[in-house]
Each structure stands twice: as structure tokens, then as C-alpha cells.
Amino acid sequence: MISVSGYRLRPEDIEKLNVSQTQRDIANRMLAMPSGYRYGSISELLFELRFREHTVKSARELINSGAKFATFSKTYGNEEFWRVTPEGALELKYRAPASKAIRNIFESGPSYAFECATAIVIIFYMALLKTIGDQTFDRNYQRIILYDWHYERLPIYTDKGNDYLPGDCLYFKNPEFDPSRPQWRGENAILLENNLYAAHGLGILSGETIIEKLNGLRKPHAQTSAYLLSQVTRVDIPALIQMIR
């Protein structure tokens, strides 16, 4: 269900929107969901649709960039734009344009290595950059630290449920992971389309294949399979719009 200023949108309203086919497909999926998506204006809804389309594209681009998976202790990045902290965070350098720094991760992927939650935040930043443009992004994001689920001025939240949409982050949990490789206790992944995910360190895979790979990374004699959690992590678009100058 989609509500705009208290008005519940119908399928014919979605058909009238001046959007791409990908965005229209996302809107129709939102319309069919039992949970409500509420916006103060049509422009907020259009922002969300653009952001989700850019999230899907950016997730694919990051997987294909050559950026590596690494634990925090082995994180590295292009030192022209980023300083690696002792904790393994990538901190935007003073006076470095945030737009160029984020784009560089996608353009010079082999110069970077980071873990999967950091990858999700990077994808969200890139999607936002594509949505609002370089100047607005640089004005609003003069300080960025890429570290796990740390983020600046990006209202990310997690809810229980199964109302998954393209551009959402989902989590595959591996309860009996190998203790010698704790980085494989689970995998964050962006939903690209029905049962197709972008998972940093694994690739673009079906849900079944992600589970199969995680099961291969369990401790000896493990009995419990990895599984997809009934939760979704996404950006609160109306709140984000209020934050951007």
C-alpha cells in the first residue's frame, strides 16, 4: 500500500507516473505489500523510486568493480581520498570531495578491500550521490567514515518482516559458522530482483546459492543451515529528504 498525503494510490495512479519501467515495477510491488509506504508528497515517492533503482545499479557495479572482501584488520583503500584508521575504517580525507571519493571506490575497485556491512553503506551512499548529484552530495557529506554500519546523515533502519523490495538490504544468518572465520557468521546482501542478490565477497547470486556457500563455511559437524532472516534494512527516504540541504 502506498499513501501520499493521506490518499491511497491505485494501480492506475502508478501507470500515470513519469518513471522508468524499473521504478514502475518497484512501485507496483510496494502497492501490493500489506505494510504501508507513506509519503508527504509525490516528489518523496519519486525520490524513493529513483533511489531504489540507483541502489540496485550501484550494487551490481560494486560487485563488478573488483573491490575485495576483507576483515576490518585488512581493510585498505585509495589513499588519495581515504585514510585507513587503526580500527579498519575508511575515513574521508580533509578537503577531499565526497562525490569523487565514493565514485573512486567503483572506478578503482582493486584499490579497495572492506567487509560486507561497509559495502552496503557504500552502495547506499553511491545511490544517493546518483539521486541528488555531486554538488548537493558534497555540500551535505563533508565527513564520511566507512566502517561496518557507521554512517553520517543517512537514516538507515531495520524492521522485522518479509516485505522485501529491490534495493533493500537483507541478511543471511549462518548460526553455526566456523569460529576461526567469524566474518562468515552471516552475509548482508542487496536484493536486485526476485531471488537475486548482490553479496560483497560472494557475487551476484540466488538466495539458495548464498545459503549453500555459507553452509560450506560452517564449523565441523554443523547441523543448522544458514537462512534468510525475516528482516529488512533500508533508508528512511522521507527522513533523508528532510536532512538534505
UniProtKB/Swiss-Prot annotation:
A GO BP entry: sporulation resulting in formation of a cellular spore
Entry's EC annotation: 2.3.2.13
Enzyme class name: transferase
Catalytic reaction(s) noted: L-glutaminyl-[protein] + L-lysyl-[protein] = [protein]-L-lysyl-N(6)-5-L-glutamyl-[protein] + NH4(+)
Coiled-coil region list: none
GO molecular function: protein-glutamine gamma-glutamyltransferase activity
Keywords recorded for this protein, A-Z: Acyltransferase, Sporulation, Transferase
Family the entry assigns: Belongs to the bacillus TGase family.
Function: Probably plays a role in the assembly of the spore coat proteins by catalyzing epsilon-(gamma-glutamyl)lysine cross-links.
Protein name: Protein-glutamine gamma-glutamyltransferase
Source organism (scientific name): Bacillus licheniformis (strain ATCC 14580 / DSM 13 / JCM 2505 / CCUG 7422 / NBRC 12200 / NCIMB 9375 / NCTC 10341 / NRRL NRS-1264 / Gibson 46)
Underlying gene: tgl
